[in-house]
Amino acid sequence: MAAAQGPVAPSSLEQNGAVPSEATKKDQNLKRGNWGNQIEFVLTSVGYAVGLGNVWRFPYLCYRNGGGAFMFPYFIMLIFCGIPLFFMELSFGQFASQGCLGVWRISPMFKGVGYGMMVVSTYIGIYYNVVICIAFYYFFSSMTPVLPWTYCNNPWNTPDCMSVLDNPNITNGSQPPALPGNVSQALNQTLKRTSPSEEYWRLYVLKLSDDIGNFGEVRLPLLGCLGVSWVVVFLCLIRGVKSSGKVVYFTATFPYVVLTILFIRGVTLEGAFTGIMYYLTPQWDKILEAKVWGDAASQIFYSLGCAWGGLVTMASYNKFHNNCYRDSVIISITNCATSVYAGFVIFSILGFMANHLGVDVSRVADHGPGLAFVAYPEALTLLPISPLWSLLFFFMLILLGLGTQFCLLETLVTAIVDEVGNEWILQKKTYVTLGVAVAGFLLGIPLTSQAGIYWLLLMDNYAASFSLVIISCIMCVSIMYIYGHQNYFQDIQMMLGFPPPLFFQICWRFVSPAIIFFILIFSVIQYQPITYNQYQYPSWRVRIGFLMALSSVICIPLYALFQFCRTDGDTLLHRLKNATKPSRDWGPALLEHRTRRYAPTTTPSPEDGLEVQPLHPDKAQIPMVGSNGSSRFQDSRI
């Protein structure tokens, strides 16, 4: 009996990941656990938001859309859409202390939004770890005196290969001389010229097939690196946020050390200033183009990780009164500042490369895998001690990818554990994590085949594109207009001690949904069939891409119909009201925080536990404070 009455039961210790010597009294929620401290949450969220796209997509978008002029619409979209949506998702998860499924006790009919988030996180988690595994492969390949993509004398090279370092008198540790005019002219005019880095990527690493349907063989080196990547992710999450919260002290901060080292090295190179000017020189006429604003809005939306479910999940492990408003501003600004900073790192090196080749910067600028695994590695071969710079660059990519991957996996695991919710699965959370990791590894195997890059880009372009916009829009509408904006504002005031600022109230109700709708319309208008270099995807593969996108969105109406059919009511309208109003257990997870309108009307029994208590037994009545200070109840959310 004494053990049962102690402050912490053994099952709680095992579930929340605390080691025996770690004082769990710091955790408010003994059932789920909390972050060790607030720095862990901030670093984890920074690692989640700051990913590969900050390095390989934003600098190219900025250069293509007017240079420094692109910063204006970019930061406008950050202020009016990015930060408000970030704050909404953090406050949503923190208030309920639930993952992306459990939070929809707020309006059970919209629980399909949570399932849609899970589907999106599954897709992203599968292909994102394949990108990390390729970075691992390049990292291991850089542990040589001479980078394997430096010269054209390898078995996989073709007669079209041309390298500025093919001269045998040039060693890897010497400063490359200026290019002769005839070589520069040849590089400009020879259409067949391929670089050693491009052939290494296409003919050796990928052994790229000629069609998306021709899978060929599984590339065993990539498969091994994929296994390494998933093992690392699993080990870092073996105790949930208790273990990942310690890892992020390194994974979320060291990339900035590497960026700074690469920046200092880059700006000291000849031609770096030219590259930076290409990146920053404003073309103010571009601001009048709708495409620039659309790209800015899309980049803000996708780079912050909105509607993936990760923000809700990470915030659910916060203590109830944590200032998530402050955190959302800090993390969002850090994410965008990192994107701008990475642009200096990328374009300083590309400017140096363009200067060496005697070509325009636009000829070497690229984005996506082409930048990370072809253009930038080729530029690194021009530097003295190039393997060192290559090791640093790919180690940075690995850490950036892992920071996002941690949250993607934890999103799925938390959703499963919260949904099942019994004591057995709480004690076996580590096995759930292992099961999800193994499933992710198996599903990623086709992406390591010779046609894998085609499928990876297909998933990247469709699985997490306009579906995220739809999910985010429905989330905004359901919280602000179905649950009720006044209800939600009062929830935040109860949690933080102050209501959301007026600016955020306006953004949540009007501005942000309008911007999200604009992004959706822009995505439809600007849609172009996916291509990879000169390869045109067959129409049937594009249809598969659309099916992947719809698979997450379709969860919303299907679950709404399911919930509507299983809800009691005398009339259709009555059933609709019952299906959309909050569940009885909606609200703060801990009894000590269920005050005022969330206070239980009956004394909870020991079997019910102390974490989650029911609301009023008849209906989830939420009192609203009128203008005269009196209290009134709002039953309907419609």
From Swiss-Prot:
Glycosylation sites: N169, N172, N182, N188
One Gene Ontology term, aspect cellular component: plasma membrane
A Pfam family that the UniProt record links to this protein: SNF
Annotated function: Sodium- and chloride-dependent glycine transporter which is essential for regulating glycine concentrations at inhibitory glycinergic synapses.
Stretches assigned to the Extracellular side: 133-219
Protein name, as recorded: Sodium- and chloride-dependent glycine transporter 1
CDD domains reported in the protein's UniProt record: SLC6sbd_GlyT1 (cd11498)
